[in-house]
Amino acid sequence: MPAAKHLAKSHSRVGAVVADVWSQLPVRDGSVHAIMDVFAPRNPAEFARVLAPGGEVVALIAHQGHLDELRDPLGILGVEAGKLERMVEQAKGHLELASEPQLIEYTMRLERDAIAAQVGMSPSARHVAPDVLQERLAALPEHMDVTARGQLVRLRKA
């Protein structure tokens, strides 16, 4: 994972782990001061186990409107309503909100290859046949303006 390697080299006190969140994370109990979760699954019980006192989870959760410009031409999944509320409910007993969620929204100008990579990392990669997706990607313009939209949430141990 190039991003994790880059992060780990950014400072002597920074570490990065890429792991299956549904397995035990390869770190000691109470040893992590910050967990960053970007458009990825969350395991509140496991996050709470590894968080140090005062530690936080910073999560970016896709919000309705995220990548909407790609939905029709590629046939990819939309973001379901109530995603943040479900995450907060699932975290009960493990994590609680540390601050009010913030809406983050901006437009990105993406090349077709970047769009393919973005879709390949998303749940849509498992819902559209690879050959169909490649055909649809080829029909896109070389560059597109695409909206990124998510909610930034800070959580701490309950």
Where does each model-flagged region fall?
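A short acidic, Gly/Pro-enriched loop at the edge of an enzyme's catalytic core
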Residues: 22-35
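Conserved Class I S-adenosyl-L-methionine
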Residues: 102-158
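Class I SAM-dependent methyltransferase SAM/SAH-binding core
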Residues: 1-24
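Short alpha-helix immediately C-terminal to the canonical SAM-binding loop
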Residues: 1-5, 44, 67
